[in-house]
Structure formats: C-alpha cells, structure tokens
Regions:
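Central regulatory/effector-binding core of bacterial HTH transcription factors
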Residues: 59-108, 116
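Interdomain hinge and pocket-entrance segments immediately C-terminal to HTH DNA-binding domains
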Residues: 23, 32-46, 60, 64-66
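Flexible loop/hinge segments that line or gate small-molecule binding clefts
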Residues: 75, 98-143, 164, 184, ...
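Flexible loop/turn connectors
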Residues: 205-321
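N-terminal helix-turn-helix DNA-binding module of bacterial transcription factors
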Residues: 1-36, 321-322
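An alpha-beta-alpha
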Residues: 144-182, 189, 292-307
Length: 322
C-alpha cells in the first residue's frame, strides 16, 4: 500500500499553509461559484442556551435555500483553528460566530478572504463585511436590580461567568452600574466569579454563605448558575424565595419548569439567531461592502416568575462565621 514519507507530507502542508490554499469540496459549485452554506460557530452545544440558536438559525437558513455547517469550540483555540479550516474547505459564504468571547485574531483567515462575519459583542475597529450584534445587558439587569430593590433587598449578590469572557465582564459591569444608579452601596465581597455551570453556581453560593452577612438575593450571570444556587439552597434548607430571592439570565426553555419557576433576564436566542442570519444575508447580497460594518442591537428584558419575594428580614448572619 503506497504511503507518503512524513517529512514530505510535512513539507507539502507547509507550502499549502503558505499559499493559503484550501481544497474546494463543493465540486466547483456547479459553475455558480456559490456554496449556499453558512458557517455557525458556538461555544458549547451542551449549554442549553445554544441549541435554540442552532435550531432557529437552521430553520431560517432552510427557508432561504441555505445549509449550515455548525461547530462547537468549547472555548478551545485549537478547535477554533480546525473549525475555520473546515469552513474554508467548504467555501462558506458567511460565518456567524456565537462564542461570546473567542479571540477574533483566530478568525483572520476568514476576514482576509472577505468572508462575511457576524460576532456577538465584538471589540476593535469596524471592518467591511464584519457585523456586530451588541447585547444591551444593562437594560435587563437594571430591571432586575430595581425589582429586587423594590422588594427591600439591600444585600444583592452577583455571580459572574468566567471573567475571561467579554460577555461575563459586560454583565458584571451592568450589575455594578445598576446598583450605583439606585444608590445602593456596593460590597465587592458579594460579587463572586462562577463558570456558567450549575456546579459553579453551587460553589460560588457556598462562598457567599460563608460571609459574616449573607445576601438576601442573588443575581446570576446565566440560568445554569441560578439552578446551581437553588440546588445549594435546597441542600442548606434555605427556602427560595422566602429566605432567598434568585434571578437568572438567558431565559432558557426549562427555566420556567424548575421549582419554583425561575425569574430571569431574557436574551432571546431566537432573535439572536435571526439577527445573525440576516446580517450574513445582507452582506452576501450587498455589492459594495459597508466600510464600517453593521451593528445590530439585541435588548434584554426582566421576566418575573416565582423565585423572588419581599425581603422580610435583615441580611442573615452566617452560622459558619467564626
């Protein structure tokens, strides 16, 4: 069976990379030069936030005669590089990058080939054929903080996502700004870093419980974190919402089915998918690219359910305090 010497293979791939060559797997696209494929990159398909985006994006794509090529990076740079090569091999017409913080430098291969891109909360100077969906985190978080203040909560904790993510930092900053707007004293001890998982929510809430004065309300950077907080509350026999008010973020599908139903901040996955697809389609159809790119705004809204209640007592002193 014929084989290629490893040294020769390495030299060939080096030349391929230097020339920027990627094989066309679409059979020359039947003379049209168009693949009618959009790429979709998400962070973690196991996170309940993302399947809804994938589903809606694909539904809209089918309606417009497009296919999608989807990949998940799990916040891994090497997986992102592999994903980009795969997308280029398939001659995608555009890519929606729904990673909420992946380094844009890794996407330079797509930019230099004038492949239309759409990001969420992108930073940096505007560029042609690069659209940005800016999330208005402040709107929904402000509503949630004002709601808790109206319920007489004065010690409101905030559990962030991984602060390596721009979106997590933006949500934390929105929380701080919202507390300042209503004149609430900010206690930095009440801001804990999480990792957007139930386990991370449990661990962060355990640290809050160890404080001399516990919070009476917890606002979480996503719903999965809030679910972890509620589970830890159950284990510690802290009743939600009687003893602790909890608010999530994202409004994932099953947030209304947990007990008690979770009050949360809605960031519509369906609308995010719709905006992302429309941004790519607009760029594909546009003969002259917008030199400054295009920005779209996605608003957030507070959704009231049953996980918050009036604070009938002062902040509880921790039984674990020394």
């Amino acid at each position: 069976m014929p084989t290629v010497h490893p040294h020769l293979a390495k030299r060939v791939w080096k030349v391929v990379e230097e020339l920027g060559y990627f094989p066309n797997t679409q059979a020359r696209m039947l003379g049209s030069g168009r693949s009618r494929i959009f790429g979709l990159i998400v962070s973690e398909i196991t996170n309940p936030f993302f399947p809804e985006i994938v589903h809606v994006f694909e539904e809209i794509a089918v309606q417009h005669g497009y296919e999608i090529l989807m990949t998940s990076t799990v916040h891994d740079r090497e997986r992102m590089k592999t994903a980009i090569r795969r997308l280029l091999e398939h001659r995608v017409e555009g890519v929606a990058v729904m990673t909420f913080g992946m380094e844009e430098a890794l996407l330079e291969d797509l930019k230099v080939r004038n492949v239309p891109l759409v990001f969420v909360d992108a930073v940096g100077p505007p560029r042609p054929r690069v659209s940005n969906i800016r999330i208005d985190y402040l709107r929904g978080i402000r509503q949630a903080v004002q709601h808790l203040a109206a319920l007489r909560h004065e010690r409101i904790a905030f559990i962030t996502g991984p602060l390596t993510l721009k979106s997590a930092v933006a949500r934390k900053d929105a929380f701080i700004e919202s507390t300042k707007e209503i004149g609430m004293a900010l206690d930095r001890q009440l801001i804990m870093e999480g990792d957007h998982t139930p386990k991370g929510g449990e661990q962060a809430f355990a640290k809050l419980l160890a404080l001399p004065l516990r919070p009476t309300a917890v606002l979480c950077s996503n719903d999965m974190t809030a679910i972890g907080v509620m589970h830890k509350s159950y284990v510690e026999k802290i009743a939600v919402p009687r003893d602790l008010s909890v608010i999530g973020f994202d409004n994932i599908r099953f947030s209304e089915y947990i007990l008690p139903p979770l009050s949360t901040i809605q960031m519509s996955q369906a609308e995010l998918a719709r905006l992302a697809f429309q941004a790519l389609l607009n760029d594909v159809k546009r003969e002259t690219p917008n030199p400054h790119g295009t920005e779209y705004i996605l608003k957030t809204n507070f959704v009231l359910r049953e996980s918050t209640a009036m604070n009938g007592h002062k902040a509880l002193r921790s039984t674990r305090a020394l």
